[in-house]
């Protein structure tokens, strides 16, 4: 599975964080609604939504 460097860096920061949820903004464009399939493919979680035209995934 290919990860862009920004997503990989964000995942590293999220995994080291002691705080709750972490947001990962992808480069995938969207037009409202859920980004579950994108988030599942990009970071392995199904939690995500479209914010400002980009899919944002949430990792606990």
UniProtKB/Swiss-Prot annotation:
Q: Which InterPro entries match?
A: Scorpion_toxin-like_sf, Scorpion_toxinS_K_inh
Whether tRNA processing counts among this entry's keywords is: no
Q: Where is this site: Aromatic residue of the functional dyad?
A: 58
- Expression sites (tissue/organ): Expressed by the venom gland.
- GO CC annotations, alphabetized: extracellular region
> Where along the sequence does the record put site: Basic residue of the functional dyad?
49
Q: Which Pfam families match?
A: Toxin_2 (PF00451)
Q: Which GO terms describe its molecular function?
A: ion channel inhibitor activity; potassium channel regulator activity; toxin activity
Location of this chain's protein in the cell: Secreted
Task: Indicate where the modification Pyrrolidone carboxylic acid is found in the sequence.
Answer: 23
Q: Which cysteines are disulphide-bonded?
A: 30-50, 35-55, 39-57
User: Keyword annotations for this protein?
Assistant: Disulfide bond, Ion channel impairing toxin, Neurotoxin, Potassium channel impairing toxin, Pyrrolidone carboxylic acid, Secreted, Signal, Toxin
Q: Which residues form a coiled coil?
A: none
Q: Which residues form the signal peptide?
A: 1-22
What family does the entry list? Belongs to the short scorpion toxin superfamily. Potassium channel inhibitor family. Alpha-KTx 15 subfamily.
What does the protein in this record do?
Blocker of A-type voltage-gated potassium channels of cerebellar granular cells. May also inhibit Kv4/KCND when coexpressed with DPP6 or DPP10. The occlusion of the outer entry of the K(+) conducting pore is partially reversible and affects both open and closed channels. It shares the same target in rat brain than BmTX3 (AC Q8I0L5) and AmmTX3 (AC P60208). Also shows a weak inhibition on Kv1.2/KCNA2 and Kv1.3/KCNA3 voltage-gated potassium channels.
Domain remark in the UniProt entry = Has the structural arrangement of an alpha-helix connected to a beta-sheet by disulfide bonds (CSalpha/beta).
Q: What is this protein called?
A: Potassium channel toxin alpha-KTx 15.8
Report the source organism: Olivierus martensii (Manchurian scorpion)
């Amino acid at each position: 599975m290919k990860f862009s460097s920004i997503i990989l860096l964000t995942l590293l920061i999220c995994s080291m964080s002691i705080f709750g949820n972490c947001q990962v903004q992808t480069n995938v464009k969207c037009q409202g609604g859920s980004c579950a399939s994108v988030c599942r493919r990009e970071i392995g979680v199904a939690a995500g939504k479209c914010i400002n035209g980009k899919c944002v995934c949430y990792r606990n």
